[in-house]
């Protein structure tokens, strides 16, 4: 077979590709106003949709584990066995306490109590943000601020609904494996409330874990003193005195430390730039979909026209 014969199919293929491209560009040119019109409609629609979306702001606090360890160090290792037998907690290590605090921060009980104590039902379910005035307002169709009455069909939202609503806007990250850094953030349409709630959450979790530890230590001290009075063994009395000392240290530490579990490295500040929605992305996606759809319609119209012409 000669080389000229081998080149013939390739030449025909190139010519067919060139014809197909010319035909495609011809179709696009013939349907240019349709393509422009459909794409423009989608572009305008995506712009309107993007502008109608509520701005969401992110307030974030950066936290580190409190410096002082609640564990008793060498004393803890010496008395760990005796404390375990007596059911006495010598104080969680830093890592364990952080894990407990994060789990508590996400818990249904803690969040429910936080919402109730800070009266967050109204802003959580009826709150809105007025861009023109830069202030939070209440939706009068959901809550009557004058009479204090909920206008929803079932009245005030339930605790479960409040927990789910708050969990959706709450984000807890960490701890970082290297630094132990933890972040607490809230994404919310009201930037003032977002920053306020984050800072209150940090204070609340520190106070909550402190209260738990003090309560456990106080109960342990009372129990150990009772056991001390009942034993005559000198060695056991020495152990009880050391355990009482360890529990007393916990209560004293709690008295002098406000930042009991988390030390605030960077408190939440009022954000001035929204994180959502990403309006430019919405518009670009809208234009892309409009352009793609217009091409499909144009090709379908041309194909239908050719089919009818052949018939």
Q: Which residues does each predicted region cover?
A:
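Short, low-order "capping/linker" segments at domain edges
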Residues: 223-234
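Hydrophobic and amphipathic membrane-targeting/association helices
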Residues: 1-218, 241-243, 247, 252-311
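Disulfide- and glycan-decorated extracellular loop modules of small multi-pass membrane proteins
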Residues: 235-241
């Amino acid at each position: 077979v000669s080389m000229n014969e081998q080149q013939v199919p390739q030449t025909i293929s190139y010519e067919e590709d060139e014809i197909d491209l010319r035909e495609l560009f011809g179709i696009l040119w013939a349907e240019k106003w349709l393509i422009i019109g459909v794409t423009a409609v989608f572009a305008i629609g995506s712009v309107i949709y993007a502008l109608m979306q509520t701005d969401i702001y992110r307030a974030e606090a950066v936290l580190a584990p409190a410096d002082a360890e609640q564990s008793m160090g060498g004393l803890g290792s010496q008395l760990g066995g005796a404390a375990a037998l007596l059911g006495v907690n010598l104080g969680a290590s830093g890592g364990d306490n952080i894990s407990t605090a994060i789990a508590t921060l996400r818990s249904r009980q803690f969040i429910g109590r936080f919402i109730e104590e800070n009266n967050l039902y109204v802003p959580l379910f009826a709150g809105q943000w007025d861009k023109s005035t830069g202030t939070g307002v209440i939706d009068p169709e959901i809550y009557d601020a004058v009479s204090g009455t909920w206008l929803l069909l079932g009245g005030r939202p339930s605790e479960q609904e409040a927990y789910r609503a708050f969990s959706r806007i709450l984000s807890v990250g960490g701890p970082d494996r290297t630094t132990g850094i933890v972040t607490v953030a809230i994404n919310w349409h009201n930037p003032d409330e977002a920053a306020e709630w984050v800072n209150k959450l940090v204070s609340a979790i520190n106070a909550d874990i402190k209260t738990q530890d003090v309560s456990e230590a106080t109960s342990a001290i009372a129990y150990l003193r009772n056991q001390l009075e009942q034993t005559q063994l000198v060695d056991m009395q020495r152990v009880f005195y050391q355990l009482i000392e360890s529990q007393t240290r916990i209560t004293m530490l709690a008295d002098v430390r406000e930042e009991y579990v988390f030390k605030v490295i960077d408190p939440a500040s009022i954000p001035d730039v929204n994180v959502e929605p990403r309006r430019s992305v919405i518009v670009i996606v809208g234009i892309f979909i409009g352009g793609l759809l217009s091409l499909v319609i144009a090709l379908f119209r041309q194909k239908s026209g050719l089919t009818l012409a052949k018939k």
